[in-house]
């Protein structure tokens, strides 16, 4: 039987530094595993003033829901920028608008990121023209992926470079079969 707690106070969630320390800076705490959740992710995200936790991106496999706990900022949704504040819910369905939450306020911005827990995802980053693919992800933590690749894609036809490989002829043995 799973002995995970069923109630967690957000003040008790351990936080880890995340980001590049420049434009992207946050502390994140994985709440879902603390609660024993496997099909639903929940992460506490704390973003200092003037920063953002993640690049502008779109998930093609899983949906996210953000709940602003405290502070204020803006959310980019494709070509729109909208103000957000404590109490707001932001929906990001799989394959919908690219999104990014930015702390434009004076105080830290705290929010919960809730998602369905796909073990595979395809992510695109419109600002940098990158794509990402991840597989074998555990508890929504990309660092656990058994395969991940991030880069820029050069368009190619599906069959481009896929010439049949000649297999060497089988050698006949002298033993019994």
PLM region descriptions:
Residues 1-39, 124-177:
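A short, N-terminal "cap"/entry segment at the start of jelly-roll beta-barrel domains
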Residues 25-30, 43-59, 94:
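Conserved short histidine dyad/triad with adjacent acidic residue
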Residues 44-49, 59-76, 114-118:
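Short, conserved beta-strand element in jelly-roll/cupin
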Residues 65, 72-74, 81, 98, ...:
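Structural motif
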Residues 79-96:
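Short acidic-glycine-tyrosine-enriched beta hairpin
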Residues 94-121:
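Ligand-binding loop in jelly-roll beta-barrel domains
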């Amino acid at each position: 039987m799973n002995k995970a707690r069923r109630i967690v106070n957000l003040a008790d969630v351990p936080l880890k530094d995340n980001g590049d320390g420049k434009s992207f800076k946050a502390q994140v705490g994985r709440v879902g595993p603390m609660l024993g959740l496997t099909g639903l992710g929940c992460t506490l995200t704390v973003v200092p003033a003037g920063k953002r936790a993640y690049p502008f991106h779109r998930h093609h496999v899983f949906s996210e829901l953000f709940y602003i706990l405290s502070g204020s900022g803006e959310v980019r949704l494709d070509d729109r920028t909208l103000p957000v504040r404590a109490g707001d819910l932001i929906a990001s369905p799989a394959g919908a608008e690219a999104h990014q939450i930015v702390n434009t306020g004076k105080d830290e911005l705290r929010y919960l990121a809730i998602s369905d827990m796909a073990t595979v995802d395809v992510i695109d980053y419109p600002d940098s023209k990158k794509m990402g693919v991840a597989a074998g992800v555990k508890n929504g933590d990309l660092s656990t992926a058994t395969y991940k690749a991030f880069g820029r894609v050069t368009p190619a036809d599906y069959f481009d470079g896929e010439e049949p490989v000649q297999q060497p002829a089988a050698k006949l043995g002298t033993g019994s079969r």
